[in-house]
């Protein structure tokens, strides 16, 4: 409270000072008739009044903050704690809140939820519910270009932007001046008088620029008001991956300057000549003619730019032979491109009748089968009652594309004072430019390429191209729009030349990987980090990014002055008083000295337990490395990680010392399973701490088997087998288990008798499916096939008694199964089949098929229609070249795709594409899938617009497919019309699992940049960690496209689409039904934690929304609802529902010339599979 009072007094002093300046300017106006002086005084008075308005708005914010802090300390109701606020309303329709609380919409959810063995889940209430729309965060509708305009109403964000920009420009100009002074001294030593004079003139100009920058910086520092509640005003102002250099044609017209402080001249001499210099990346591109009236009539400059970031415009006064800079302006080229995109969109929407959701009227009527009415003068062209809408033709009433020239014409602020009138346009050079927003079309998915990882003391350095000004964490010098090295684990950032000098260990490295003899610096003085008011350009000493303004996210050491982000504090080593460069130099010298000494003792490689090699059991007293439960060392878990993704599983209990080696693996397994039930009955299991089963054994050694058994009962993640080498590979690894399990085991009664059926993840399985495997007498890392699940039917209530063949199963296979207690505790989390599951069906190969047609092509392969030679059954076969898989490091992603297919096969989900078989040849791998002859929804929506009923029907079936994936820990990440197939009975099947990610439960996150541009969620574009809520964002885009026959976010290329996703609000026809707008608004919420479906109940939130009020989910799941459309074919091999671009291609396998080595072929061992229903 004292800080607030102090800030209020400070703001009041600033208001008084501005008022005094305005009074002085008014007094001066009375004593002069000079037009130039009067114009300058008018500008000062206008600026002063604007500053007063800004300060008064900050005073109101402070008063509100003071009032809120007082209310927070009050108890609102008797007996209610201040820390237990009132229950907010749910994420659903705000106006329909009372209606939902009275029973929801139809209430069939409980019938469907029993299908997966769970209890009925209603939409979440507190604390998972979002606030009502009236209190939702408003996104500011401005760009960076808006902030540098003279009349911008966004003065607060402008102050933040200019403080950062001016501080950086000042530091760069000082470095430039130091370089010039060195040149002056060099030329003086050489006696080159002409070059010395030129350098001296540059030094004088640089000094003058420094004075301008200091003057401007002081002005903005005086205007800045530090309020704790201030955060970043706009997330899209600093997009780490999108502010990249651009190439194209720039047109710039300079009209006039005004309110500038001209150079002083003699009383009787003429005024100075004024001209403007235009620079692009320090290269002069144009210069205006000199003028004495601050105006130019025909100053148009057209020039091409190549991979440039910024334009610098400098206004000069020329007095005699001297040039004096009087005003400066910097414009990012990407900001010009973004402004032109927004203007183009605004022009299209001016008369279309489409508005943002918050501007919708009170249209509450529900139209039974809505077809949006076009504006007057246009005739409907799609849907029932109208002809089909051909591909590329815009839906009725949609905004029409703008084809005329778009120009930016405005007054922009000069620094430190003045303004300049500019007209600009920019045409990008893009190789993949497409017509702006002409309906829906096919677009391929993008995936972040796997980068070469360089490991340095636990850091996993990857080369990154930075489009912001970064600061090296080692040498503290800048990286200006350059490539650097960044650790993919902790985000430590440095120059490419500096990363070999880094010898401080990455904090994400576990203690087990620390060499006891590694070099250590006896300088353990922790920093005293505290919040500070960041008013200028300061950089994080760890990740290298510029710090935001304000106090919320910034820390500063009181002793040494080091600054960093609040979330980077725990990454900074305890080297207070010593720079990182000096610390690393000392550590390097220590290591060099030790390296020269005797190396008789064993090295690190002989002491560390490595997952790739067999390791002896640890002694009972030796604790294992702390870390996530069930998580192995980073070396193994990242070796085959899909897309180098950084998984963040839900938090769990810490590891404890491993089980004593005297216990056998079977005893450990028995004890763990027998105590799981008693340990779990004490308290309910939360969504983040529930059990989740691993998929395969890691070892046969007693210690590792015991640890794996114990982990299996409680660990949130599962350790999957990375490969399926023969037993001779001899790989093994150990893992710890949580405290609760060890304690419960010590208190357990006599272990239960060995019963394989208890450990199975299915109620029963046919005896014929079991193949007893011999138990080797040495540690192995071999994987055993899981029993094939039966077709979906009502499961028996009690497990059957094991047969003799089942009793002979090896202990390792028993350990791969899930205990019933884990299934009973969290019904939504199920066993994931191993990647090397062979299946139980008949083995097939390439000789069994004839290829008939090409059905589609993607970034990673092609899909062909094939029939079996004997039965003439039709299948769709996805063909991938092994050479491509290995070259692009896609081995693990191919395994992952197979595992996701097995998850879909497990219950034969009605809306997921099933896999019949996998096989391989020397050059290719093949996925044999069921053939869906109705084509995809992209083709059908191009033929004609969907009505509401049809879109709702498809959305409901897709929702159940995503629900099943999420219940099995899979996020889909590539939801789009192209990947939704239509069966001949009118139902859908979701296909293409190439971008799926496993082990993604509630609370888990990953960070790979992948997906189809129009469907990618903002958190993916912002390089943030994301969870399964990205699927619900894509679900919102999908519903929007099905209802309106166009995408909510449009652009000519991927960059424009990304900008639209981050900055634009989706638009809707003015008469669109309220329920449709509501679900889209809640699914297309940029904050993932506020998005519908982001809570622990996942799809249940969406299923209970008013948009699906008439849906009976049990009937949808069992296909008892009559589909609204039935596709037609003339024969079983008719491919008319597929794109002729693909079907016209001859279905042949192109020859592959390369020969893979034995080691490469070994990567695909165990890929073959055949389903029991094939």
From Swiss-Prot:
GO terms for biological process, alphabetical: fungal-type cell wall biogenesis; signal transduction
Active-site residues, record numbering mapped to chain: 974 (proton acceptor)
Domain annotation Protein kinase: ranges: 849-1108
Domain C2: 229-349
UniProt cross-references to SMART domains, sorted A to Z: C1, C2, Hr1, S_TK_X, S_TKc
Residue ranges occupied by any REM-1 domain in the UniProt entry: 1-68, 149-226
Biased composition (Low complexity): 96-123, 624-636, 658-709
Keywords: ATP-binding, Coiled coil, Kinase, Metal-binding, Nucleotide-binding, Phosphoprotein, Repeat, Serine/threonine-protein kinase, Transferase, Zinc, Zinc-finger
PROSITE patterns per UniProt: AGC_KINASE_CTER, C2, PROTEIN_KINASE_ATP, PROTEIN_KINASE_DOM, PROTEIN_KINASE_ST, REM_1, ZF_DAG_PE_1, ZF_DAG_PE_2
Annotated binding of ATP, by residue: 855-863, 878
Gene Ontology MF term list: ATP binding; diacylglycerol-dependent serine/threonine kinase activity; protein serine kinase activity; zinc ion binding
Biased composition (Gly residues): 380-389
Zinc finger (Phorbol-ester/DAG-type) residue numbers: 458-506, 526-576
Superkingdom field: Eukaryota
Bias (Polar residues): 69-84, 596-611, 720-744, 808-820
E.C. number(s) listed in UniProt: 2.7.11.13
Residue span of region Disordered: 69-140, 358-406, 593-842
Pfam families (alphabetical): C1_1, HR1, Pkinase, Pkinase_C
Stretches assigned to the AGC-kinase C-terminal domain: 1109-1174
Biased composition (Pro residues): 124-134, 648-657, 786-802
Catalysed reactions listed for this entry: L-seryl-[protein] + ATP = O-phospho-L-seryl-[protein] + ADP + H(+); L-threonyl-[protein] + ATP = O-phospho-L-threonyl-[protein] + ADP + H(+)
Family per record: Belongs to the protein kinase superfamily. AGC Ser/Thr protein kinase family. PKC subfamily.
Record protein name field: Protein kinase C-like
Organism: Cochliobolus heterostrophus
């Amino acid at each position: 409270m004292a800080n607030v009072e102090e800030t209020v007094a400070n703001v009041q002093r600033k208001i008084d000072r501005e008022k005094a300046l305005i009074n002085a300017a008014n007094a001066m106006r009375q004593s002069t008739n000079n037009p130039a002086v009067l114009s300058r005084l008018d500008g000062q008075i206008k600026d002063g009044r604007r500053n007063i308005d800004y300060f008064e708005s900050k005073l109101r914010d402070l008063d509100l903050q003071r009032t809120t802090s007082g209310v927070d300390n009050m108890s609102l109701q008797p007996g209610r704690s201040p820390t237990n606020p009132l229950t907010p309303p749910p994420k659903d329709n705000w106006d329909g809140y009372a209606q939902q609380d009275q029973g929801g919409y139809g209430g069939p959810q409980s019938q469907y939820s029993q299908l997966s063995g769970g209890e009925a889940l209603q939409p979440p209430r507190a604390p998972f519910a979002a606030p009502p729309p009236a209190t939702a965060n408003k996104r500011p509708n401005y760009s960076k270009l808006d902030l540098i305009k003279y009349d911008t109403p966004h003065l607060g964000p402008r102050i933040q932007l200019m403080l950062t920009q001016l501080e950086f420009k000042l530091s760069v100009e000082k470095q430039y001046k130091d370089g010039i002074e060195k040149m002056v001294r060099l030329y003086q030593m050489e006696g080159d008088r002409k070059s010395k004079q030129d350098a001296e003139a540059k030094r004088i100009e640089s000094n003058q620029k420094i004075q301008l920058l200091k003057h401007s910086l002081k002005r903005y520092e005086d205007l800045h008001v530090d309020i704790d509640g201030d955060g970043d005003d706009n997330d899209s102002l600093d997009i780490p991956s999108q502010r990249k250099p651009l190439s194209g044609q720039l047109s710039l017209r300079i009209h006039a300057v005004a309110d500038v402080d001209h150079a002083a001249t003699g009383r009787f001499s003429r005024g100075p000549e004024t001209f403007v210099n235009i620079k692009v990346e320090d290269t002069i591109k144009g210069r205006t003619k000199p003028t004495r009236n601050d105006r130019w009539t025909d100053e148009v400059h057209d020039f091409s730019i190549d991979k440039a970031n910024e334009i610098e415009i400098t206004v000069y006064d020329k007095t005699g032979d001297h040039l004096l800079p009087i005003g400066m302006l910097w414009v990012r080229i990407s900001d010009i491109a973004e402004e032109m995109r927004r203007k183009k969109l605004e022009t299209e929407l001016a008369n279309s009748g489409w508005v943002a959701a918050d501007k919708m009227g009170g249209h509450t009527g529900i139209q039974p089968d809505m077809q949006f009415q076009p504006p007057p003068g246009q005739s409907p062209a799609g849907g029932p009652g109208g002809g089909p809408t051909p591909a590329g033709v815009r839906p009725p009433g949609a905004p029409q594309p703008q084809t005329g020239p778009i120009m930016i014409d405005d007054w922009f602020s000069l620094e430190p004072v003045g303004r300049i009138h500019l007209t600009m346009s920019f045409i990008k050079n893009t190789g993949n430019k497409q017509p702006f927003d002409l309906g829906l079309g096919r677009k391929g998915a993008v995936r972040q390429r796997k980068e070469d990882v360089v490991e340095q003391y636990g850091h996993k350095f990857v080369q990154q191209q930075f489009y912001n000004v970064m600061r090296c964490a080692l040498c503290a010098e800048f990286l200006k729009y350059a490539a650097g090295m960044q650790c993919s684990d902790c985000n430590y950032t440095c120059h490419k030349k500096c990363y070999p000098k880094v010898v401080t260990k990455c904090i994400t490295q576990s203690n087990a990987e620390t060499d006891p003899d590694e070099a250590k610096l006896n300088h353990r003085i922790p920093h005293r980090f505290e919040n500070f008011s960041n008013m200028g350009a300061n950089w994080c000493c760890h990740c290298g990014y510029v710090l935001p303004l304000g106090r919320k996210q910034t820390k500063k050491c009181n002793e040494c002055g080091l600054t960093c982000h609040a979330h980077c504090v725990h990454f900074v080593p305890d080297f207070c008083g010593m720079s990182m460069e000096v610390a690393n130099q000392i550590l390097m010298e220590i290591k060099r000295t030790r390296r020269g000494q005797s190396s008789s003792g064993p090295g690190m490689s002989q002491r560390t337990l490595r997952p790739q090699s067999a390791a002896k059991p640890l002694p009972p007293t030796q604790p294992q490395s702390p870390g996530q439960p069930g998580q192995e060392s980073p070396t193994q878990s990242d070796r085959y990680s899909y897309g180098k993704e950084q998984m963040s599983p839900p938090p769990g209990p810490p590891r404890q010392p491993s089980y004593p080696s005297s216990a056998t693996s079977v005893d450990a397994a028995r004890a763990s399973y027998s105590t799981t039930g008693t340990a779990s009955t004490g308290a309910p299991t939360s969504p983040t701490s529930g059990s989740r089963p691993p998929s395969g054994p890691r070892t046969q050694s007693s210690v590792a088997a015991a640890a794996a058994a114990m982990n299996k009962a409680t660990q949130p993640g599962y350790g999957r087998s990375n490969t399926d080498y023969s037993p001779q590979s001899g790989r093994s690894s150990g893992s710890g288990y949580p405290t609760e399990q060890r304690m419960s085991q010590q208190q357990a009664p006599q272990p239960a008798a060995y019963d394989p059926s208890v450990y199975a993840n299915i109620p029963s399985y046919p005896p014929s499916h079991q193949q007893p495997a011999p138990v080797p007498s040495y540690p192995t890392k071999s994987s055993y096939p899981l029993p094939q699940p039966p077709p979906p039917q009502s499961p028996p209530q009690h497990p059957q008694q094991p047969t003799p063949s089942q009793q002979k199963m090896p202990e390792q296979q028993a350990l791969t199964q899930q205990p019933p207690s884990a299934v009973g505790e969290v019904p939504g989390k199920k066993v994931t089949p191993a990647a090397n599951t062979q299946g139980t069906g008949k083995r097939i190969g390439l000789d069994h098929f004839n290829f008939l047609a090409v059905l589609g092509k993607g970034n990673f392969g092609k899909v062909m229609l094939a029939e079996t030679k004997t039965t003439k059954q039709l299948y769709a076969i996805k063909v991938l070249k092994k050479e491509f898989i290995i070259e692009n490091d896609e081995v693990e992603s191919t395994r992952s795709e197979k595992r996701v297919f097995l998850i879909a096969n497990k219950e034969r989900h009605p809306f997921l594409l099933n896999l019949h078989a996998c096989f391989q040849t020397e050059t290719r791998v093949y996925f044999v899938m069921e053939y869906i002859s109705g084509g995809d929804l992209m083709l059908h929506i191009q033929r004609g617009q969907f009505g509401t009923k049809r879109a709702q029907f498809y959305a409901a079936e897709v929702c159940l497919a995503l629900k099943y994936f999420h219940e099995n820990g899979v996020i889909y990440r590539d939801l789009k019309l192209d990947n939704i197939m239509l069966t001949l009975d009118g139902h859908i099947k979701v296909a293409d699992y190439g971008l799926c990610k496993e082990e993604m439960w509630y609370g888990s996150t990953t960070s790979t940049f992948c997906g189809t541009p129009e469907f990618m969620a903002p958190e993916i574009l912002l390089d943030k960690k994301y969870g399964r809520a990205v699927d619900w964002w894509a679900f919102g885009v999908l519903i929007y496209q099905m209802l309106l026959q166009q995408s909510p976010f449009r652009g000519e290329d991927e960059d424009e689409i990304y900008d639209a996703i981050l900055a634009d609000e989706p638009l809707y026809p003015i008469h669109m039904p309220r329920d449709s707008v509501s679900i889209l608004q809640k699914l297309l919420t940029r904050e993932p934690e506020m998005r519908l479906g982001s809570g622990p109940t996942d799809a249940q939130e969406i299923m209970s929304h008013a948009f699906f009020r008439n849906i009976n989910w049990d009937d949808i799941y069992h296909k008892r609802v009559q589909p609204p459309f039935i596709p037609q074919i003339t024969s079983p091999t008719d491919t008319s529902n597929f794109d002729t671009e693909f079907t016209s291609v001859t279905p042949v396998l192109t020859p592959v010339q390369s020969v893979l080595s034995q080691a490469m072929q070994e990567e695909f061992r165990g890929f073959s599979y055949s389903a029991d229903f094939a």
